[in-house]
Swiss-Prot record:
It is found in: Secreted. Belongs to the neurotoxin 10 (Hwtx-1) family. 51 (Hntx-8) subfamily. Hntx-8 sub-subfamily. One of its GO terms (cellular component) is extracellular region. Keywords: Disulfide bond, Ion channel impairing toxin, Knottin, Secreted, Signal, Toxin. Ion channel inhibitor. GO terms for molecular function: ion channel inhibitor activity; toxin activity. It comes from Cyriopagopus hainanus. Residues 25-52 form a propeptide. This is U3-theraphotoxin-Hhn1a 5. It comes from the Eukaryota. Disulfide bonds join 54-67, 61-72, 66-79. The keyword Cell division does not apply.
Amino acid sequence: MVNMKASMFLTFAGLVLLFVVCYASESEEKEFPKEMLSSIFAVDNDFKQEERDCAGYMRECKEKLCCSGYVCSSRWKWCVLPAPWRC
């Protein structure tokens, strides 16, 4: 009877340990793609876009005025191409 209790306890402890190890490795695997993508798409200071006084196509125009050739959409508040049906 004692051997059965001990073997059940060891089995349960082994399953808990296995769960902890699997969870730890899975959480590391979830972080790996994020780290990889952030290193691939990291923006270097040399390649940053210049800050403009105006907003370009499909840029938010709440605080900035749209660049020439674009108008601020009254509905979406984005800079869009002018059209007769847009105000």
